Amino acid sequence: MKARLWQTLFLLNTLIISEVSFAEDANKDVRDLKEQNIMSVLYQQTAAERLASSLQTFSSAKRALDIALADPSWSALPGQNVKDKKTAIIVDIDETVLDNTAYEARMILDGTKYPQGWVSWGKEEAATEVPGAKDFLNYASSKGVTIFYITNRVVELKEATQINLTKLGIPWDKTKETILMRGENNWDSDKGSRRALVAQEYRVLLMAGDNLGDFVDAKYNNLSPQKRKAIVEEYADYWGEKWFMLQNIAYGDWEGALYDFNYSLSPDEVHNTRIESLEPIR
């Protein structure tokens, strides 16, 4: 009897140890994968070069805004009918206006992965300003231009986002719906329908974002890296004139494109795909 009892206890102990070991290995895989992002997040948070790039982008956008206001035929939306319309700009929020690199740093240090902790982070209302964003947006507002924020933050974060913007002195119109969130009105992550909604009443003078999908519809964004580059080249005349891209080397659809937008890959598969995507010249 004692022998059978000890045998049972031994088996249970082995199973528990195996399960704990498996969980620890899984957490280690996630941690190792996130640690590959350390240099990216450090660049976003500490590099003088990133600061210069961001200030440069918004300074260029400010000059472009003056040109756009002086030209009644100007539009940042290809083929838009601009007759008798009010003026507006469209900007993304995350990594365009609000800097969430503190959340990225947390994930690295805690060994977690998105979307773990994302909603909680948003509700802290602690994101900082992307350098140059506030100055540019206040300038646009002073010119009577309506600012539309088209973001893929979930609608649950709407109030927290509004508070975060207000804390930073970033303008948003409280008299109309100008912060358009994912999940509102059946909007999905494709921002095209929201841009089209704005275009019904407004002449869109320029757009700013950190992701190709902030400028083009999903069918042109959710492609291979090579095809996404071809789309960028197709709109070469828009960049720096009507469309303004902010640097974000920490995350984005540029990474999803490496995996063919298959987010069910294991950490090992993600790591291997990253390695295979490198292009050395020897």
Q: What function would you assign to each model-found segment?
A:
Residues N27-K28, K158-R282:
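C-terminal cap/substrate-recognition subdomain and adjoining C-terminal extension
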Residues F22-V91, D260-R282:
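Non-catalytic pre-domain segments flanking phosphatase-related domains
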Residues E95, A133-T166, D210-L212:
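Substrate-recognition element of Asp-dependent hydrolases with the DxDx(T/V) motif
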Residues E104-E129:
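Metal-dependent phosphoesterase signature
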Residues Y43-S54, V119-A126, F148-V154, G183-E184:
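Second-shell loop/turn segments in exported
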Residues L9-S18:
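Bacterial N-terminal signal peptides
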Residues I89-N100:
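Asp-based phosphoryl-transfer active-site loop
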Residues M1-L9:
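Bacterial N-terminal signal peptides that target proteins for export
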